[in-house]
From Swiss-Prot:
Residues 169-181 have a biased composition (Basic residues). One of its GO terms (biological process) is positive regulation of DNA-templated transcription. Expressed in leaves. GO terms for molecular function: DNA-binding transcription factor activity; transcription cis-regulatory region binding. Residues 177-236 form the HTH myb-type domain. Residues 207-232 bind DNA. Residues 145-183 are annotated as: Disordered. Gene3D superfamilies: Homeodomain-like (1.10.10.60). It comes from Oryza sativa subsp. japonica. Residues 145-163 have a biased composition (Low complexity). GO terms for cellular component: nucleus. Probable transcriptional activator that promotes chloroplast development. Acts as an activator of nuclear photosynthetic genes involved in chlorophyll biosynthesis, light harvesting, and electron transport. It is found in: Nucleus. This is Probable transcription factor GLK1.
């Protein structure tokens, strides 16, 4: 059997002898061993367990849902200390079956065995402990409390853990249901949100102040914070796009202006004749200045000499010299200018000016025929055919009928071509003959015996 006894009792040796006589094994600690483990709760330094927890960067910044904390607090407050009462187990219930559990002696010893009554009697004969009555009673109370706590701890811990788990499940369900509720940001609600943000400033707006300005009870600070983050991100994106569009517009203007330093190109003239594949017409040459001879011209070898009295002097002394010729001015464009000219008018002798109409060059009429050249056939003169005189109406009708109904020679020639080349398609206007027409033509020509059609 097993007997447990504390080291506080002075008559441990006597009790060991009694237990040995009874055939039981006593487990305990001697006074020498107890001196080595003599410590109290005050000697334990709890600061080592929370070492370096005062630093802010050690613990992560966890998001704690206030709904869960408040739900736990409300559950504890409504229970009214039921958890504490569950842990308190009456001593009578534990010590009632003394025959099965054992006897509690004045020193707080528990004896487990069949002869526990005799062991308790032997303990009473010894006269108890040699300590004071007050100390003995205190030890008895401490031992009873320890036994009660040890025996009641499994059941009480199980019940309290089950209740805590059920409360946590209920609170998590309620908080989970609250988190799933989403806010429908209608255009009116978003407009009020934007007004509140603009009133506070985009950089100084905080969710609590926005919620106060909006004054809507269905919104929470978490909803405002989430929408504010999305609004700032969208606004930043739009500002970046506007800046990029402005930069592109500025670059396009700079390129269109030629970099700013180049002068603006003159507008193209709408009356310019388009030239496709031909160089632009050269500018008209300036009018040559008249040559003035103020002295006697030099004699050229081989030319006859002239009488100096007959040599004309230029300019004459009685005439006033003319001024410079006025610059050439192009003629005004006509009302319907041409936009194309024939290639033969591109020569230097026929350079079209601005607004020259497109018309054919007139052919000069030959007054006299060219003299015949031996060995060359003369070019025949083009003469248009004179239209015939208008005939009577009967002649015109007959001519139209002839034109509509071809002649028999042309029909025979076409039929001969078809018969000689049967693999070619029929010429335009010919159709394959029908059976009725062929039979009628044969009967008309006197052919009576016609073989039946094959197939």
């Amino acid at each position: 059997m097993l007997a447990v006894s504390p080291a506080m009792c002075p008559d441990i040796e006597d009790r060991a002898a009694v237990a040995g006589d009874a055939g039981m094994e006593v487990v305990g600690m001697s006074s020498d061993d107890m001196d080595q483990f003599d410590f109290s709760v005050d000697d334990i330094d709890f600061g080592d367990f929370f070492l370096r927890l005062e630093d802010g960067d050690v613990l992560p910044d966890l998001e704690v849902d206030p709904a869960e904390i408040f739900t736990d607090f409300e559950a504890i407050a409504t229970s009214g200390g039921e958890g504490v009462q569950d842990q308190e187990v009456p001593t009578v219930e534990l010590l009632a079956p003394a025959d099965d559990v054992g006897v509690l002696d004045p020193c707080g010893d528990v004896v487990v065995g069949e002869e526990n009554a005799a062991f308790a009697g032997a303990g009473e004969e010894k006269g108890g402990c040699n300590q004071d009555d007050d100390a003995g009673e205190a030890n008895v109370d401490d031992g009873a409390a320890a036994v009660e706590a040890k025996s009641s701890s499994p059941s009480s811990t199980t019940s309290s853990s089950q209740e805590a788990e059920s409360r946590h499940k209920s609170s998590s369900k309620s908080s989970h249901g609250k988190k799933k509720a989403k806010v429908d940001w209608t255009p009116e609600l978003h407009r009020r949100f934007v007004q509140a943000v603009e009133q506070l400033g985009i950089d100084k707006a905080v969710p609590s102040r926005i919620l106060e300005i909006m004054g809507i009870d269905s919104l929470t600070r978490h909803n405002i914070a989430s929408h504010l983050q999305k609004y700032r991100s969208h606004r930043k994106h739009m500002i970046a796009r506007e800046a990029e569009a402005a930069s592109w517009t500025q670059r396009r203007q700079i390129y269109a202006a030629g970099g700013g330093a180049v002068a603006k190109r003159p507008e193209s003239n709408a009356w310019t004749v388009p030239t496709i594949g031909f160089p632009p017409p050269p500018p008209p040459p300036p009018s040559p200045a008249p040559i003035q001879h103020f002295a006697r011209p030099l004699h050229v070898w081989g030319h006859p000499t002239m009488d100096p009295s007959r040599v004309p002097v230029w300019p004459p002394r009685h005439l006033v010299p003319r001024g410079p010729a006025p610059p050439w001015v192009p003629p005004p464009p006509p009302s319907d200018p041409a936009f194309w000219h024939h290639p033969y008018m591109r020569g230097p002798a026929h350079v079209p000016t601005q607004g020259t109409p497109c018309m054919a060059m007139p052919m000069p009429a030959a007054r006299f025929p060219a003299p015949p050249v031996p060995g060359v056939v003369p070019c025949p003169m083009y003469r248009p055919l004179t239209p015939p005189a208008l005939a009577s109406k009967n002649q015109q009708d007959a001519q139209l009928q002839l034109q509509v109904q071809p002649s028999s020679e042309s029909i025979d020639a076409a039929i001969g071509d078809v018969l000689s080349k049967p693999w070619l398609p029929l010429p335009l206007g010919l159709k394959p003959p029908s059976v009725d027409s062929v039979m009628g033509e044969l009967q008309r020509q006197g052919v009576a015996n016609v073989p039946p059609a094959c197939g």
